Regions:
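Short acidic/glycine- and proline-prone juxtamembrane loop motifs at membrane-interface regions
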Residues: 102, 108-115
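Short helix- or helix-capping micro-motifs
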Residues: 2, 93-98, 146, 150, ...
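Aromatic/acidic, Gly/Pro-rich catalytic loop(s) in extracytoplasmic/lumenal soluble domains
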Residues: 356-370, 397-485
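Specific aromatic-rich, kink-prone transmembrane helix
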Residues: 71-75, 115-133, 142-146
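Transmembrane-lumen/periplasm boundary regions of multi-pass, lipid-linked membrane glycan transferases
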Residues: 160-258
Length: 485
């Protein structure tokens, strides 16, 4: 099942186009550092390596994600086995994981989420083995996984908090004084040190990004969306299964040793909901609960001769599991993508139309008088737009694109004499309009036409030409143009 997941993802890896985050990773990879405003160095470095090996090849860029997704499926089955599942329970857990929203969505794209998924599951598997065997040396595996994960994002620290809280609540509390556990904590800090030092030296900008996410300024964020996502991120079909797994972990006498894992999810999801984080942050632990629930469900379906139980499980696969494939993978034609797909899967729309986006900007650039065209620059509202123009702009003779979004602000600001600016994605003429504050005059000169009917963040967006910079770039770049989210 793990191999089938990886192969399927690889077969579909070249469909549609780059995701905005992938374009950002590729651009960040040209500016390698030990940390960034919104992430660690791991994924940008990986993106640079893969694009160096095979420039412009989406399949190569996404191969690690497909492999990690297959690894996640294998780990879910392995966790079910640790809990005592037989072959049937392990297979059922693997199927639920393979068709889950979090595995399919993160396995299709190069993403920090894919790294998080595997890191959390490796740590969870080691935690379950530690609790089952009592051998605290397995804590070293937890420390190693969390440390590597924190080179991608600081999010694995949330799992560490959940596991420590789970042990405090359910025991065994002696683990918190164990030398191997303390050594594991040291490994985590040592591996994470480059990113942590960078964050500390720059005022922990990831906390600012987290605040923007909490305010709902990012996809899948905010308390309401985070709560709703709990019921669909694996699949609606899996909800009663992972709930059964949670109850069993917290109440089964024979699973007393594993109660800390159940409490870890309760603590983590509580923090996510209170803080307004993204609703998929706790998804790896939901897969752990699903592994436990698979064992409980298979036992329930096998009890006695009640054939309807097995029939009920089988009938639910088509309406509740298989739609994930259509909604989360690029199996439908991009030019005829139904609106409901983008409504459910925001990321699908963000992988369509980037070359056409660059064409739209190029048309505005070509329309400038020659003397302005030679000194014009592009200012984008977000990192996806800047990444797309870095990828597709040179072939269209476009000037360099700048942006103040997240770490883009640190990659450079426009030259001091850049007073003709093609502003992409900025809404002008409204109260609080930044373009009006920065420039003497701005003219709407075009709109983004991605040549497909898709409701994403860019299609139909405005393109202004602005002239007459009111204040030097050096005065406004870090204070006004800079923004996170």
């Amino acid at each position: 099942m793990a191999a089938a997941t990886t192969v399927t993802l690889l077969l579909l890896a070249g469909r549609y186009g780059y995701h905005r985050d992938e374009l950002y990773f590729l651009l960040a990879g040209r500016h390698l550092d030990w940390g960034y405003v919104d992430q660690g160095p791991l994924v940008p470095a990986l993106a640079r390596l893969l694009d160096t090996i095979a420039p412009g090849n989406l399949v190569v860029l996404r191969t690690p994600s497909a492999v990690l997704a297959g690894g996640a499926v294998l780990l879910v089955a392995a966790i079910a086995r640790e809990l005592g599942a037989g072959r049937g329970g392990q297979l059922f857990a693997a199927v639920l994981a393979a068709l889950s929203g979090i595995v399919l969505a993160s396995g299709h794209l190069l993403s920090t989420t894919t790294v998080d998924l595997l890191v959390w599951l490796v740590a969870a598997w080691c935690a379950v083995r530690l609790l089952r065997t009592g051998d605290s040396r397995w804590a070293l595996g937890i420390g190693l996984a969390l440390g590597v994960g924190m080179l991608s994002k600081l999010l694995p620290a949330l799992l560490a908090v959940g596991l420590v809280a789970g042990v405090l609540i359910a025991g065994p509390r002696r683990l918190l004084r164990d030398r191997w556990v303390l050594a594991a904590a040291g490994i985590t800090v040592l591996l994470a040190a480059p990113n942590l030092i960078w964050q500390a030296a720059n005022g922990f900008p990831q906390l600012g990004v987290a605040a923007s996410i909490s305010d709902g300024d990012s996809s899948y964020s905010g308390r309401r969306d985070a709560f709703t996502l709990q019921f669909v991120i694996i699949s609606p079909y899996a909800v009663p299964i992972w709930i059964a797994g949670l109850i069993a972990l917290l109440r089964r006498p024979e699973w007393r040793a594993y109660r800390a894992v159940g409490w870890a999810w309760v603590v983590v999801v509580g923090i996510v909901l209170i803080a307004g984080g993204k609703g998929y942050y706790d998804a790896p632990l939901l897969l752990v609960l699903t592994a436990a629930g698979a064992l409980v469900t298979v036992a329930w379906a096998s009890r006695g001769s009640l054939w309807w139980r097995r029939g009920l499980l089988a009938l639910g696969v088509v309406p509740f599991l298989l739609p994930n494939v259509v909604l989360l993978l690029p199996v439908l034609p991009a030019d005829r993508l139904p609106g409901f797909v983008v409504d459910v899967n925001y990321d699908a729309g963000e992988t369509i139309g980037w070359p056409e986006f660059a064409d739209s900007v190029a048309r505005v650039h070509r329309g400038l008088p020659p003397e302005e065209r030679s000194r014009a620059v592009v200012l984008t509202a977000n990192y996806g737009e800047a990444g797309a123009l870095a990828r597709y702009g040179p072939a269209r003779d476009l000037p360099r694109a700048y942006s103040g979004h997240n770490s883009m602000v640190d990659f450079g600001r426009p030259p001091a004499d850049a007073d003709v600016v093609i502003a992409v994605g900025w809404v002008g003429g409204e109260p609080g309009d930044p373009l009006g504050a920065w420039f003497e005059r701005c003219t709407l000169s075009g709109v983004v036409d991605q040549r497909v009917e898709v409701d994403n963040d860019e299609n139909g967006g405005p393109i202004h030409v602005c002239r007459g910079l009111r204040r030097p770039w050096s005065q406004i770049w870090d204070t006004e143009v800079r923004h996170t989210g």
